[in-house]
């Protein structure tokens, strides 16, 4: 990715998909060229959390909401220390942000961090195209980086695909750090960082949990060195089929019957550890308004999603695994994709969506309490 941080408001830009479809607009954010997987997010709010979610590493995010940037950028809402998206696509960016917490405009923040974007294109048409044709490689070109369309298309087709990409270690912490419990400490949790969002350990800390966040390359010995009451596997980018290291660690956790909770990528890791396969969705689930049903209670939750892969597990039967019986606990009501797994003979469960609600609804916050209950039960 090559970028310039000079003003981009009137600089021409072109978005080129790997199937040859092009969209012309204006540069937004940094000027230059970038590549990634084109995906769309249906959230109308929460763009700052979306941009800083490590799960979006190497993806160009298309916002379906037409107006983006209205509330500017503040210093409180980022989910990590930097923007992770490879590129950003909006229809009509706010000219002047308005919010009491705003410190700068979204355009300024994108330029400051060197994120290439494009505005002024028909994002509705682009979203429909991705929905019908599937997520695909894309390039955004602006400024002096505007060669002829044939050259741009060739460059897009040379970019790496998301399938087969092993990305967790690229976004995870390199060193272990500790998020202290808020108030009295009740439990210790080892959290394997595969691309963890900042709000996730905070939600656990609110419940009296001291969270030791470990690198994606952590071994089972590293996990148990902190003497955990429970183990957590986070969200993250890339293809779960490549994550053999975390799968091996999770199998050791399951063998020891330590309380276990996984979110997003962690759900896919649990699926693999139990012997299920994973597969790439046509265009994925991304946004903060996805309906999921808890198959145990029948309750429907509106949830936040960001995943392009899913677990291939039977929906209507209990499966025998090396670690006991397992079943699908949650499904997406839009397409019946597996959104949660639970073991029936030991304290382990996971969900494909994001109960930490950053951004998004708080319907699934109870899952952190369920994790606490599993650790309480193990102590009893």
From Swiss-Prot:
Catalytic center residues: 264, 354, 356
Molecular function terms, GO-annotated: ATP binding; carbamoyl-phosphate synthase (glutamine-hydrolyzing) activity; glutaminase activity
Protein task: Small subunit of the glutamine-dependent carbamoyl phosphate synthetase (CPSase). CPSase catalyzes the formation of carbamoyl phosphate from the ammonia moiety of glutamine, carbonate, and phosphate donated by ATP, constituting the first step of 2 biosynthetic pathways, one leading to arginine and/or urea and the other to pyrimidine nucleotides. The small subunit (glutamine amidotransferase) binds and cleaves glutamine to supply the large subunit with the substrate ammonia.
GO biological process: 'de novo' pyrimidine nucleobase biosynthetic process; 'de novo' UMP biosynthetic process; glutamine metabolic process; L-arginine biosynthetic process
Family: Belongs to the CarA family.
Region called CPSase, residue ranges: 1-187
Protein name per Swiss-Prot or TrEMBL: Carbamoyl phosphate synthase small chain
Record note on quaternary structure: Composed of two chains; the small (or glutamine) chain promotes the hydrolysis of glutamine to ammonia, which is used by the large (or ammonia) chain to synthesize carbamoyl phosphate. Tetramer of heterodimers (alpha,beta)4.
Residues binding L-glutamine: 55, 236, 238, 265, 268, 306, 308-309
Organism: Streptomyces avermitilis (strain ATCC 31267 / DSM 46492 / JCM 5070 / NBRC 14893 / NCIMB 12804 / NRRL 8165 / MA-4680)
Record Gene3D superfamilies: 3.40.50.880, Carbamoyl-phosphate synthase small subunit, N-terminal domain
């Amino acid at each position: 990715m090559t970028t310039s941080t000079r003003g981009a408001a009137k600089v021409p830009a072109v978005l080129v998909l790997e199937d040859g479809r092009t969209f012309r607009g204006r540069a937004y954010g940094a000027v230059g060229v970038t590549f990634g997987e084109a995906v769309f997010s249906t959230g109308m709010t929460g763009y700052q959390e979306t941009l800083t979610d490590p799960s979006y590493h190497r993806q160009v995010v298309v916002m379906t909401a037409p107006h983006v940037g209205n509330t500017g950028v503040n210093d409180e809402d980022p989910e990590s220390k930097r923007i992770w998206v490879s590129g950003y696509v909006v229809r009509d960016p706010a000219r002047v942000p308005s919010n009491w917490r705003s410190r700068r405009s979204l355009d300024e923040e994108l330029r400051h961090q060197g994120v290439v974007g494009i505005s002024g294109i028909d994002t509705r048409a682009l979203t429909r195209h991705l929905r019908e044709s599937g997520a695909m490689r894309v390039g955004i070109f602006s400024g002096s980086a505007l060669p002829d369309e044939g050259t741009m298309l060739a460059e897009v087709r040379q970019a790496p695909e998301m399938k087969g990409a092993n990305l967790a270690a690229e976004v995870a912490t390199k060193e272990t750090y500790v998020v202290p419990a808020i108030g009295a400490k009740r439990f210790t949790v080892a959290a394997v960082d595969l691309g963890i969002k900042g709000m996730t350990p905070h939600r656990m800390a609110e419940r009296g949990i001291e969270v030791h966040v470990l690198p994606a390359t952590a071994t089972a010995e590293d996990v148990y060195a902190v003497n955990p009451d429970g183990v957590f596997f986070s969200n993250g980018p890339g293809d779960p089929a490549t994550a053999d290291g975390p799968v091996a660690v999770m199998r050791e956790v399951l063998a020891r019957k330590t309380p276990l909770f996984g979110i997003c990528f962690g759900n896919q890791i649990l699926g693999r550890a139990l012997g299920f396969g994973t597969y790439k969705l046509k265009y994925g689930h991304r946004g903060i308004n996805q309906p999921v049903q808890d198959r145990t209670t029948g309750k429907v939750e509106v949830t936040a999603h960001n995943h392009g892969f899913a677990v291939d597990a039977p929906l209507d039967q209990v499966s025998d695994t090396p670690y006991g019986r397992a079943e699908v606990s949650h499904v997406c009501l839009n397409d019946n994709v597996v959104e949660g797994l639970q073991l029936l003979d030991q304290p382990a469960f996971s969900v494909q969506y994001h109960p930490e609600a950053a951004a998004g609804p708080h319907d699934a916050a109870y899952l952190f309490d369920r994790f606490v209950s599993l650790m309480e039960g193990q102590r009893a």
